[in-house]
Structures are given as structure tokens and as C-alpha cells.
């Protein structure tokens, strides 16, 4: 099974980040294939105040697919958007989360929460970054070294910098090593099994249709979706739980067995084949694809520029 958290205590000084690997990681951060690992972010609701908050709104539980799409689109904007768009998205999220505070309901009636509490906010951010990091090798088949993992983490920290809260407590872990230590500590001391985590884990057995689809499309797709959703949910569950921290997976009640390793390897081999043979237009989300096309065009435009505007052949007065 894929190792989720590498307990790296130092980076080999001889290790170097290979440019081709970093380019592949950047592509991966905009790939539709990584969506199959999205349920690894269930670690977010293993932090009970987060579970209380999302349980109170009901949106997560009503339609997990919608919630995943919204979160994914926001993250993609942070990674692939222009600087102005990234900053605007960060401010939008902070502004909208100001109203997310109070007491939970039902099983969480005694739980107080505030979305802008750095303890909750940073946990969700680090969770999202680790989903992208931990799904890289399963999707691409590329095995990276410690320096490359650190460079990839720094890419994500820079992309999500607009989400950091003010003050020292609002800063994300500065290095991958610190982030891994922080994650392990949260698993050991802060996370807990809870009814909401149980419900969303069980809900993977039948993924709902996205409500953003036009009503006629939803109506036409509903019969087929009712057949394929259980299978799709199974793939998402195995892929996601295959990269999930063992301590978090234990909290979900899901017991990983040897046959799950076989299933995980089968799915990831198919993903790696798709990664190798499918064109970017298919593998990447439109925002990432168009950004890369733009960068290629910029490079082409600059390739015809002169190195200098000085007269050729040296000084004419020489």
C-alpha cells in the first residue's frame, strides 16, 4: 500500500529535485485523475469541531459530490489562477467563513466551533495539500526523492499562501518535515471517531449526482447513475483510503485487508496508464490545460526576441 506520511527527519544533501519530476507534479496538481482520491480529505471531519461545523450546515452530507466539486474548484483556482485571482479567492473564503461559528447540533450539540480558528483552518489546508502530495505516485507511477517532495510541498504552500490567517498561529508548516510531524501529532492527539465521519464514509457506497447539472441532464442520467454510482464510489473509496494515514483510516471504521492492496494496485495501474497515454486536454482540468498552453505561447513569443538591441558587429566608432 502507498505510504502516506513519510517520516522524513532530514533531506539527503545529495538529493536534488529533478525538473522533469517537478513538471509532472505540477501537471498532477491540475489532473482530473487525482479526483479519485478526494475522499482522503475525510480526515478533515475526524477533527470533531470541523465535523460539527459541516454537520450543522448539512451541505456536505446532503451531496458529498457537490462539496467535493466546490472544494476542488477552489483549490484549482489557488494553484492555477493568476495572482489576483488567487488573492481574491483567499479573501472570499475567509470572508464567507466568518459566519461559520457557534455550537453543533444533534450529536455535536456540546461542541463549539469557529471556522477561522487557526487549529481548524490549518488542519483543513494541510489535509488538502497532503491529498495532492500523497496521490502523486499512485496517479503517475513516479517515485520521487525527499528533495522533490519538499519542493512539491513548497509549490502548494506558495499557491495557498493567500489562505493563511494573520499571526504566527495562522502560518502553515514551513517545510514538509514540519507538516508531516504536525499531521502525525494531530492524528495522535486531536482526531477522533465521530458519527459524522461514520456517515460520510458509509455514503461513499452511493455517490450523488452533482446538483449543478441541468435538470434535464440529471433526469436523463439518473437511471444510469444509480447503476454505476456504487462502482464509482468503490473506486473512490479504495483509492482514497489507500493513501489515507492508517491512524485516520482506523477512525473511519474501515478495515484494510490484503485484498484491498490488490484492488488498489489494479486501479492505480490503470490510472498510470491513462497518465502516460492520454493527452493533456483529457487529463487536465480546463484551467490547468489553458494555463500550460498560455505558458507555451509565452515561451514561443519570447524565443524570437533579440538578446540585445546593441548594433551588430560591435561599436561603429571603433
What are the residue ranges of the model-derived segments?
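Mature, function-bearing regions of proteins
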Residues: 1-318
Amino acid at each position: 500500500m502507498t505510504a502516506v506520511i513519510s517520516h522524513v527527519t532530514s533531506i539527503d544533501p545529495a538529493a536534488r529535485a529533478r525538473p522533469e519530476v517537478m513538471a509532472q507534479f505540477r501537471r498532477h496538481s491540475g489532473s482530473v485523475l487525482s479526483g479519485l482520491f478526494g475522499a482522503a480529505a475525510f480526515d478533515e471531519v475526524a477533527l470533531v469541531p470541523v465535523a460539527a461545523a459541516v454537520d450543522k450546515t448539512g451541505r456536505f452530507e446532503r451531496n458529498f459530490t457537490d462539496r467535493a466539486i466546490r472544494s476542488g474548484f477552489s483549490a484549482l483556482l489557488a494553484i492555477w489562477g493568476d495572482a489576483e485571482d488567487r488573492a481574491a479567492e483567499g479573501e472570499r473564503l475567509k470572508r464567507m467563513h466568518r459566519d461559520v461559528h457557534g455550537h453543533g447540533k444533534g450529536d455535536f450539540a456540546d461542541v463549539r466551533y469557529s471556522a477561522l480558528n487557526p487549529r481548524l483552518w490549518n488542519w483543513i489546508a494541510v489535509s488538502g495539500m497532503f491529498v495532492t502530495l500523497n496521490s502523486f505516485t499512485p496517479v503517475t507511477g513516479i517515485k520521487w526523492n525527499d528533495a522533490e517532495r519538499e519542493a512539491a510541498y513548497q509549490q502548494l504552500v506558495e499557491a495557498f499562501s493567500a489562505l493563511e490567517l494573520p499571526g504566527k498561529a495562522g502560518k502553515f508548516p514551513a517545510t514538509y518535515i514540519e507538516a508531516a510531524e504536525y499531521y502525525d501529532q494531530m492524528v495522535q492527539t486531536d482526531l477522533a471517531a465521530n458519527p459524522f465521519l461514520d456517515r460520510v464514509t458509509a455514503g461513499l457506497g452511493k455517490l450523488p449526482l452533482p446538483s449543478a447539472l441541468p435538470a434535464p441532464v440529471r433526469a436523463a442520467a439518473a437511471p444510469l447513475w444509480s447503476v454505476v454510482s456504487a462502482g464509482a464510489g468503490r473506486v473512490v473509496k479504495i483509492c482514497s483510503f489507500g493513501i489515507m494515514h492508517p491512524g485516520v483510516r482506523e477512525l473511519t471504521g474501515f478495515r484494510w485487508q490484503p485484498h484491498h492492496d490488490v484492488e488498489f494496485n489494479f486501479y492505480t495501474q490503470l490510472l498510470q496508464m491513462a497518465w502516460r497515454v492520454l493527452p493533456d486536454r483529457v487529463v487536465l482540468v480546463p484551467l490547468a490545460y489553458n494555463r500550460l498552453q498560455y505558458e507555451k505561447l509565452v515561451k514561443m513569443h519570447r524565443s524570437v526576441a533579440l538578446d540585445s538591441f546593441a548594433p551588430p558587429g560591435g561599436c561603429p566608432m571603433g
